[in-house]
């Protein structure tokens, strides 16, 4: 079994918060990170945001909304993205074990979300050089991102996290260059599976998969376009 990436052996405190303003959730993350550094528990926040654009540290001016829509600038990695209703956002506030391996941490988050998609009947992959979880291009369509990941690690503690598109309004992504990637698309579980998949339908399985991946119960496997994860259905 793969070792846990966490420095604590205690269970992760999973909190389902409903809908939370982005700035309020960001402050809550910082407060929880301070508490974790002081010896508090690892925490996983699961929630939705009112519609908002957020920009990571590498966002370029031309990737922002063309109409001047306000953007919240953050201290996470990555570029610009959208959060809003119908998208499950997860913020793991985790103390990482030494030696720190941020790439492994991101791969574990991807693994968890790939499993959730597979259990729903959707084959997803990793795309080399691009974080997140992707539906491979087919029938003339490009690769499509169904889950985005952008994290920050400070004092060996993680902040920010992932966003899984369930039944969100995909048109909101048209005003930006999502994650700075112009040659790929954005999709949702509902769009790909052609049936409604709401946040409430996946929140429990996401919580379980993330905890299992971080603790090594769910091992990281190869999920490239040439080695797709098998559907569980």
Curated annotation (Swiss-Prot):
EC number(s) stated in the UniProt entry for this protein: 2.3.1.181
Subcellular location field: Cytoplasm
Biased composition (Basic and acidic residues): 57-66
Annotated positions binding substrate: 76-83, 148-150, 161-163
BPL/LPL catalytic domain: residues covered: 38-218
CDD domains named among the record's database cross-references: LipB
Site (Lowers pKa of active site Cys): 145
Keywords for this protein: Acyltransferase, Cytoplasm, Transferase
Major location (coarse): cytoplasm
GO biological process, one term: protein modification process
Superkingdom field: Bacteria
MF term (GO), any: lipoyl(octanoyl) transferase activity
A Pfam family it matches: LplA-B_cat
Associated pathway: Protein modification; protein lipoylation via endogenous pathway; protein N(6)-(lipoyl)lysine from octanoyl-[acyl-carrier-protein]: step 1/2
GO cellular component, one term: cytoplasm
Active site: 179 (acyl-thioester intermediate)
Region spans: Disordered: 57-77
Functional note: Catalyzes the transfer of endogenously produced octanoic acid from octanoyl-acyl-carrier-protein onto the lipoyl domains of lipoate-dependent enzymes. Lipoyl-ACP can also act as a substrate although octanoyl-ACP is likely to be the physiological substrate.
Annotated NCBIfam families: lipB, PRK14345.1
Miscellaneous: In the reaction, the free carboxyl group of octanoic acid is attached via an amide linkage to the epsilon-amino group of a specific lysine residue of lipoyl domains of lipoate-dependent enzymes.
HAMAP family from the UniProt entry: LipB
Name of the protein this chain belongs to: Octanoyltransferase
Organism encoding this protein: Mycolicibacterium paratuberculosis (strain ATCC BAA-968 / K-10) (Mycobacterium paratuberculosis)
Organism taxonomic ancestry: Bacteria, Bacillati, Actinomycetota, Actinomycetes, Mycobacteriales
Gene behind the chain: lipB
